Every structure is written in structure tokens, then in C-alpha cells.
């Protein structure tokens, strides 16, 4: 990796331990699929980046440029399956996600950012976790374990009052990699910590476990708190009327 400069531009972002072997062998995701009518979404082209040149230059590590690349990656591969116009775009995104995560890791490895800079340190951990989640969605070996590791480090580094929101995001990650029991536990902790928004993903995770009554309880509580979010009403209607199925979706090996 190209040496990182000592000047760092502002960095903006925003279960029990599962080892890499388990993540690598378990290429399935448990999904609760709601049979709701939805419009077909076509992927927009993924931009072309030279990640290293965009992020590293004489002034140091360009956090704004890194954020822009990560946002474009999230637009296309923030959920599984990824959305790309063609395989070439997908391959470039895979390379970009790995490269950008490596550059962020370099900030820690070279001690350019340390725990003595708590906000920047947490920002870097969060960026690596998110990029590794994206890389996992792109079927990069080892990415899920790396995301898990950095979410755990991030939670430990956060003040107690800030952990509920991050538990919600981490719970979403756990659900996405098929760790449904761990996801429910993490999302429950998020709700108990005051994150009412976590009730929606918690309801969906409970539905994945076949716990319809508990799922509806969380979905209804969410809908009451956030009546403007139409998703909750649609999910509740689908669950109540049996327009959903729980299935295992195989992630293709590459």
C-alpha cells in the first residue's frame, strides 16, 4: 500500500464471536420475503475510480473523497444481492471496496489515527466495518469476519449512550449474514437502549425466526412511533394476511 501521509483530512462517517471459517463456510442468508408489489429498480452505472489517487495525495488522506466512494459503493452493494448494470462494474466495485478498506486500515496500522483521537478512531472503525459489509455482499472472502471484528471494536470504543444506534446497525449486519439469533439479541439490546428505530429490523428478524406474534408486536410499536414510515404498515398487512414467506437464499460462490 502506498505510504499514508501524516496529515489526516477530516474523517466523516456518518454475538458471540464468529470466526472467519464460519463466515466463509456459511454462504447463506436467512431472509423474510414479503410478497409486496414493488417497482422494478434498474441500477445506475457505477463510477470509475482510482481509489488510491483519489484518497491519498500531498495533503494527506482525503476523507471527503473516501466518503463519496463509499456512498457510491453502498448505493450499489449496500444490500444483497448487489445492483450493477454489468459484471465489469461489479468487479471494479469489489476491487474498490477492498482497496478503500485497506487504506482505512492503514491509518490504524501506521498509527496515524489512534485511540487517543477517539472521534477519528471510531470513524475509521466504522468505515472499515461498513466497507467490509459491502465487500461481503460482493462475495469477497473474509470480508464478513472483518466487518464483524470492526463492529465489535467500534461498540467497545463508543460511549455507552451512543451504543444503541450502533447495535441497531450491527444487528442489521448480523441478520444479513444469516446470524439471525445473534441479530435478534443485538437488536433487542438496541431497543432496550432507547433505539425505537431498531424495532423495524427487529420485527423482520423475528419474522425470520417464525415468531409472528413477537414480530407484529415490534412492527406495531414502530408504526405507532413513526406513522410517516409506510413500510411498517405494509409489513404488518403482509404478515397479518400471510403474504410473506421465510426462505434461505443461497449466495452464489465466485
Regions found by a protein language model. Give the residues of each.
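N-terminal leader/linker segments that initiate helical-solenoid repeat arrays
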Residues: 42-107
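N-terminal signal peptide c-region/cleavage motif recognized by signal peptidases
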Residues: 38-40
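Terminal, low-structured helical/coil segments at or just beyond the last alpha-helical repeat
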Residues: 217-254
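Structural signature of alpha-solenoid helical repeat junctions
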Residues: 96, 119-124, 143, 162, ...
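Flexible helix-coil transition and linker loops at the boundaries of alpha-helical arrays
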Residues: 103-122, 153-163
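Alpha-helical adaptor scaffolds
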Residues: 126-201
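Register position in tetratricopeptide repeats
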Residues: 134, 176, 208, 241-245
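Amphipathic alpha-helical repeat scaffolds of TPR domains
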Residues: 61-86, 117-138, 164-165, 169
